[in-house]
Amino acid sequence: GLLWSNEYVKNRATVLLSNIERMGIRNAVVSSSHPEPLCDRLSGFFDKVLVDAPCSGEGMFLHDPGAVEAWSPEHVLSCAQRQGSILDSAAKAVAPEGILVYSTCTYAKEENEGVITAFLERHPEFILIDSGVTFGRASETLPQTRRIFPMDGGDGHFVAKLQKTTGESYGGEWFVPRRNQSDAVQKQGKELYHSLSKEKNCPTILEAGTYLYLLPEKLPDLTGLPILRAGVQFAVIKKNRLEPCHQFFTAAT
């Protein structure tokens, strides 16, 4: 499978990439894109999409004084509008019969039940299903959703799970490595991979600058997208030889 992690704010996306590397995730793409163009390109691609939406952060008041200072009724409404827009974009990227999960860390009904109710009115192709979360408590107005208050062991979290009943699957282009890949470097890369890995089949190796990357399978076309990383940073070219990168060993364990 493929894990695609996107964060629009660039410095947060850099932290996201660091976490992906630290956790040794091999099959990931990390991007820093506005949701709309990204989801337009990847329409119908994902079986599961999680929207951890930017919110007013009422659940963070105890831990973050800045969240208290930033709060206002207008901010709540602004967040709800932005959340609805993000959900509209994310809905495009969900494959038929796929799952869309929406979560926040705020108490505001405008950002939780209100956003989901309005989304369902705009998107009859989606249905609300049970969240599957067994702790916390059901919402009074949308019992399939879940609220997790501090007395439940959370920080005011909300989660809703939706399923797409109709639509078209991904029909876009698939990733093809550029033609200017060095045959000699490819050969060296495969030899290095087999000397370090017990796996029989070597993943697709992408040469980009002085680095080699091991790409995930079934990768869509990445042309023009703000990609921070696709796959695993495998090796670096130094003086006509390859040195394995730290991330490869992190991902191999």
Model-identified regions with their sequence ranges:
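Residue-level signal for inorganic ion chemistry
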Residues: 3, 16, 49, 98, ...
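Helix-to-beta-strand junctions that scaffold the AdoMet/dcAdoMet cofactor pocket
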Residues: 94-96
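S-adenosyl-L-methionine
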Residues: 2-44
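Class I S-adenosyl-L-methionine
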Residues: 128-153
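Local beta-strand N-terminus motif with an aromatic residue
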Residues: 45-47, 124
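Mobile active-site "lid"/loop adjacent to the S-adenosyl-L-methionine
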Residues: 11, 48-86, 105-112
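Conserved Class I S-adenosyl-L-methionine
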Residues: 113-135
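Polybasic, low-complexity RNA-engagement segments
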Residues: 155-158, 165-253
